[in-house]
Amino acid sequence: MEQAKTLFFTTPKQVEVRETPLPPLKADEVLVQTICSAISAGTELLVYRGQFPQLSEAHDAVSSGLKYPLAYGYACVGKVKGVGKAVNREWEDRSVFSFQPHTSYFAAKIENLFPIPHSLSPQNACFLPNMETAVNLVQDGAPILGERVLVLGQGVVGLLTASLLSEFPLEYLVTADQFEFRRQTSGKINKVISLDNLNAGEAKAQFHSSGYAQNTFDLTFELSGSPSALNDAIEYTAFSGRIVIGSWYGRKRAEIDLGGAFHRSRIKLISSQVSTISPELSGRWDKSRRFDVAWKALERIKPEKWVTHRFSIDEAEKAYQLLDENPQEAIQVLFKYDDVV
């Protein structure tokens, strides 16, 4: 009998792949064979390192709570291999996306599946959750014609956000990251000026020599995953500017200086999380409309060019060790299944 291989986080910095029988199909379900799944490094490293908070509700639909052992992940692309009795057979062999943990097979109801546009490869489709996040960030930031925008952090979400922002008629768009590889990648995006991260003295000197003084930016996105970066965001955001905080920090802590210029700067701090839609938009926007925007953005940007590493699901330990110990070498890491990719 065919077995499903599922990745489990068992304790901090320990993962294992478990084999289980394929789930029996209910009448309203389909069986999906996974082609590839994407590691969301920022979120999954919190789980891998044991830095996630104990939540009464998970931040997504994957599980109702975060505790070990935990099957986690939310970016699976696969092909429908079987359909339940109540499901239209047109679903057979259809390529689909689902918010599922890393697993080689899974059963799902069709309302939890997203048909993938024919113009997108499976690897491009793996970026859907992060693209939806980027769309949500840009909507929450609401950039205005001629604004000066700064994006701190050029991981996958930062690169996608910068790519969307590059389509706006801004005065300038600046990105910053501590890793040279990510800065080089970001600098290839149209209209982006990519600089070193702002923490070190040399980096700040470079920033100022480039003509970007303190209190410069109308809109800043904090996407680095480091709570201390909020100090940089505050320092470089102009009077009455906005800071959109898209990072999930988990249990990471940092001292934030709110006693200086921040007190009189009237800066607005905006927490942005993709599970909801901003109240200002929810009367006209729903998740379906936002997903449509995300699919179209994937077709334009084609982010699979940012896939730096591909591992078999059986090599999961190597994948997380890479992201944990050598993050400067990686951008997007994918799992592949049965050499399909």
Model segments located where?
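N-terminal glycine-rich beta->alpha transition that marks the start or flank
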Residues: 20-76
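A glycine-/small-residue-rich N-terminal strand-loop-strand element
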Residues: 75-99
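Short, well-ordered loop/turn sites that connect or cap secondary structure elements
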Residues: 89-91, 143, 237
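A structural motif shared across PLP-dependent enzymes of the aminotransferase-like
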Residues: 99-110
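Mid-domain Rossmann-like dinucleotide-binding core that forms the NAD(H)/NADP(H) cofactor-binding site
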Residues: 121-199
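Glycine-rich cofactor phosphate-binding loops and adjacent beta1-alpha1 units
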Residues: 184, 188-270
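C-terminal substrate-binding/catalytic core of Rossmann-like NAD(P)-dependent dehydrogenases/reductases
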Residues: 214, 256-307
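C-terminal hydrophobic helical "lid"/dimerization subdomain
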Residues: 285-341
